[in-house]
């Protein structure tokens, strides 16, 4: 009987360690978003010197967290801010850059894409979503609350004053060569994120997440900054934290 109890104890301990590892993998990452030193030109060229002072975020991971393979391709994401705007850049490693969706607010994630989710008020309720593909086609929307709380997406909403641009390092929709990837720059005015007259700049910490949908297989791969533990990014209380610093 003793050896069976010992075996059970070992299995239970292993399960506990596995659970702890999963819990640790779901701890929200924190990004210190620094003030921009100079003017940022939104042209998709992330190598510009104005991004030199922005620290890259931690590596993207599988949306499910620990125990799943690391993303096949690297994503380097940075953020900056000034008095008026939030700036986001991403460099996406991609050996075969492809995109088909061309119409604004069509379903961009049917292509490989880059996605931004912002909850400026830190309440894990109302949030904003931005997506783009390598053609620079934008899909943006407002969620009044998460789907799990009966939320509805408002596709007719657009970011007022949004600017974004994409640059392909290679060739688009040509699979007989090898590309480096593509990059995106985004400018979101703070006043586009105001809610009920409240200024989002008064909140020093935001909830946020960033994602890549990658069609290496079916179903697709989902690579994110802050894993949620399941294949569902619409869980704001599992997102990472942006801290605004001077």
Where are the regions a protein language model picked out?
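Positively charged n-region of N-terminal signal peptides that target proteins for export
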Residues: 1-4
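Bacterial N-terminal signal peptides
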Residues: 7-16
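Structural preference for beta-rich elements and adjacent junctions enriched in aromatics
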Residues: 21-246
